[in-house]
């Protein structure tokens, strides 16, 4: 750099030296920008109020144990905190009380009885949210305007028709061109949000029949969040260096471990999976299925048959 600066003389600058000087300076700045990790500005968003789970939708023995009966609704963050602070050992492993009182599948219980507590496969505090979510159950009905509506996955059309018949929602004929559009009052939206833990997607209190159908389909679908998953092939464990446990004919690993292992194969700059990883999993994941981590997890695992224990 000194040789370029020496060639810069006031009022007598060589064009070639000037070009070389600025090129070098620009290269330095670019290198600095690439190597420096600039903190991203967080979008300033108003924090949404946390939903309260109706007491009757939380496992009754859990409600009784922690004296939550008189609550107007229980924050999911409170449930998470109670689970983490009362059912785990000091080193973060699920304790014997948790095995008895929390909702575990039969497979999960068998795995816990097979492996050592020090194993990375053992249920730990990283699984708190899954265990806490299992303490709440989906509503089977909701009440509005003096009517009771039952939620059944195979009778959603009947449910929508009944809502229309009772005038709980009204057909908006002006907007109904390609699809039937309904006016849904704020009061009903509040009831659905409270009882079903999510709101329907509306705009100016208008919702299409298709979206309303999809909404009820989602909220009536059983939550099958898994702590352990079955690998399609033992070679997957070798490719991803996963800890596993064999139960009968199936090889299990923790869902969180599999997800983390796949996530680590994503290039931090291109946000795409590494080519070497593609080559390793090509037998199990088609090219059009390499969409994201969740999709790859689905392709590498066998759907679990979930049988819950300790449920009420």
Curated annotation (Swiss-Prot):
| Main localisation | virion
Return the InterPro entries for the record: Poxvirus_I1 (IPR004969)
This protein's GO cellular component annotations are: virion component
Pfam families on file: Pox_I1 (PF03289)
Q: What induces it?
A: Expressed in the late phase of the viral replicative cycle.
- Any idea where this protein resides? Virion
Mention one GO molecular function.
DNA binding
Keyword entries, A-Z: DNA-binding, Virion
TM stretches of this protein: none
Any additional notes? Each virion contains approximately 670 molecules of OPG077.
Hey, which family's this protein in? Belongs to the orthopoxvirus OPG077 family.
So what does this one do?
A: DNA-binding protein which binds to the hairpin form of the viral telomeric sequence. Required for the production of mature virions (MV).
Official protein name in the record: Telomere-binding protein OPG077
Q: Which organism is it from?
A: Vaccinia virus (strain Ankara) (VACV)
């Amino acid at each position: 750099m000194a040789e370029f600066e020496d060639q810069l003389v006031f009022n007598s600058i060589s064009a070639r030296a000037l070009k070389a000087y600025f090129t070098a300076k620009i290269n330095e700045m670019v290198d600095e920008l690439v190597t420096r990790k600039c903190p991203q500005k967080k979008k300033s968003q108003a924090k949404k109020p946390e939903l309260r789970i109706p007491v009757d939708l939380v496992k009754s023995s859990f409600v009784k144990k922690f004296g939550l009966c008189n609550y107007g609704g229980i924050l999911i963050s409170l449930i998470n905190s109670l689970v983490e602070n009362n059912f785990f050992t000091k080193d973060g492993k699920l304790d014997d009380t948790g095995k008895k009182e929390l909702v575990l599948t039969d497979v999960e219980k068998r795995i816990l009885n097979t492996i050592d507590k020090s194993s990375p496969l053992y249920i730990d505090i990283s699984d708190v949210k899954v265990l806490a979510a299992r303490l709440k159950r989906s509503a089977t009905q909701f009440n509005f305007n003096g009517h009771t509506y039952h939620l059944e996955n195979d009778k959603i059309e009947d449910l929508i028709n009944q809502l229309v018949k009772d005038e709980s929602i009204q057909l908006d004929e002006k907007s109904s061109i390609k699809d039937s559009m309904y006016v849904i009052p704020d009061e009903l939206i509040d009831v659905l949000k409270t009882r079903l833990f999510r709101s329907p997607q509306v705009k100016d209190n208008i919702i299409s029949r298709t979206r309303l159908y999809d909404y009820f389909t989602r909220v009536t679908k059983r939550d099958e969040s898994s702590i352990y998953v079955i690998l399609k092939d033992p070679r997957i464990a070798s490719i991803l260096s996963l800890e596993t446990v064999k139960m009968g004919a199936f090889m299990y690993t923790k869902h969180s471990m599999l997800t983390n292992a796949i996530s680590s194969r994503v290039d931090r700059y291109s946000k795409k999976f590494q080519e070497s990883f593609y080559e390793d999993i090509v037998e199990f994941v088609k090219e059009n299925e390499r969409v994201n981590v969740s999709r790859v997890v689905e392709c590498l695992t066998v759907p679990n048959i979930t049988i819950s224990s300790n449920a009420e």
